[in-house]
Amino acid sequence: MIFTDYRNVDLTNKSLRTVPVALYAHAEDIKSLTLSRNPMLDIPGDFVQLCTSLQELRLSNMSIKKVPQSVQNFTTLMGLDLSSNRIGDINDIALYRLPDLQELRVQNNRMEKLPWYFPRLHLLRLLNISNNKFQDVPEEVCKMSSLEELDISFNMISQLPEDLQSLQRLKILIIVGNRVTRIPDSFRRLSNLGVLDCRRNNITELGAVSLLPNLEELLVGHNSVQALDVSSGPLLKRIDISHNDVTQISLAPGPVGRIPVGLTYLNVSSAKLSSLDDLALGQLTSLEELTLDRNKFRAIPDSLGELSLLRSFSCSDNLIGALPSSIGRLQRLERLDVHNNNLTEFPTALWNCGSLERINMTSNVIAHIRLPSLPPASAAPPPPTLGFPESALSSTVTLVPCLPDRKASTTGSVAPSSRSLPPLVKSLQRLYLGENRLTDDALPLLMILRELRVLNLSFNDFQELPRQFFKEIVLLEELYLSGNKLAGLPTEDLPRLNKLEVLYLNGNRLLTLPQELGKVINLAVLDVGSNGLRYNISNWEFDWNW
């Protein structure tokens, strides 16, 4: 066995039953030693005495039931990992002999209690006892005043003791997957707590936990909370209260009389919300990600347009019939997901979103794609971002026909000129419009989205693609046209699709495939199933006509 670095020795899964002899001569140089996943039951005492500089020892996944006695003699240890074993208790190992121990990981074991001496571990900052058999928070933990991070997840704990308030240095508390029903009022004294993760419990109310002055992240998903009163502290940035029974969100002023405008992330998906307070939403001006999936919304307030920093907005699986026109003011919006709603048309305001890269409007009832209307003649001229030529604008795109038999000289009038393209044209890369009611009238405006990499138009009512459909969208990597009524493909620009890798044409009315398809050099996936393709075995050089 050859070693190149004696400071950090990793012997994971080497089928070792003892420490290699080659390490003895360099034992004093070892800072970190990993012996995980080996059938080793003990560490030789003479080797331990030679390790005068060891700071980290990892003994995880070794199927041990008892901690090797020699571990307590590594007096310079700062981190000890005993996770994922079969340890029932650590009472017979004197860890208090490790005066510098700062991190102890004993998760994924079979422990029910902690040793009496744990409060004597005066420097211990991190303790992970998750996924054991604790029915209560060990009283020893409440006396460990040096703790900064505590993980007691996936035990059988039903109540948090009031004495946890004594952990004044605690910054991270993780209690995921227990049976806790409430957060004690005494938690307001945990003034240094920055992260509280209490997902997957039975919590019905949060109390004043969000008032903590240093709390930055509050994760309460998969509980039974019915109302969220976010009277937040000054540093709160992230709230995840998904998968609860929330029917109301109130954003009341905090202790210093200010609204929690510092929030950057809010997830209230899979709740029971039917509306949002217009004024309250408009106050969350620092939001960057807002997720409202799987609720009962029929409308989104106009104040959505006040969230000028919003990058991601997801409101899928609701009952929304239209998006507010104010969404066009979200110039930093990059991702929009509103699939499985009741949208009847592509929101015209979206054409003004200059950073939008991904739109998912799958499974709606969209029948139209429209451009914004021109302002009245007496009005001030439109801003540069909406300077469409009059010949390209209409209330619907039906006024701009584009048929396969139209000459090339006339197809150029389908789209606005390159100098007046709406901002969305230059940013949109992924567009998902599958399972809607779009017809051929919607195709001209899709043809100008020249930055598209992924376009999904499956399961609509398209019958014929314009002759120059592929002229501008040559950056396509994936194209989905399944489940339409297409009888052919336009061939003029097919060879220019040199980035196309995935093409789905299944479930159409194709009788033949164009020979030009063979010139799409990077095509890796082609699905033409469930068509009427004819194959002539005698005409092998035209093998495309399957």
Language model regions located:
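LRR N-terminal entry segment and analogous cap-like coil->beta motifs
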Residues: F3-Q55
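Conserved hydrophobic beta-strand positions in leucine-rich repeat
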Residues: V9, K31-L35, Q55-L59, L77-L82, ...
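Consensus "Asn ladder" position of solenoid repeat domains
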Residues: K14, N38, M62, N85, ...
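The feature encodes a structural signal of leucine-rich repeats
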Residues: V19-A22, I43-D46, V67-Q69, I90-I93, ...
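Leucine-rich repeat
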Residues: A25-D29, Q49-S53, Q72-L77, Y96-L101, ...
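Solenoidal tandem-repeat scaffolds enriched in leucines and small polar residues
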Residues: R97-L98, Q102, V106-S232, K237-I249, ...
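Leucine-rich repeat domain C-terminal region
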Residues: E205, E217, Q226-V230, L236-I239, ...
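Eukaryotic tandem repeat interaction scaffolds
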Residues: R258, S270-S274, L279-A280, T291-R294, ...
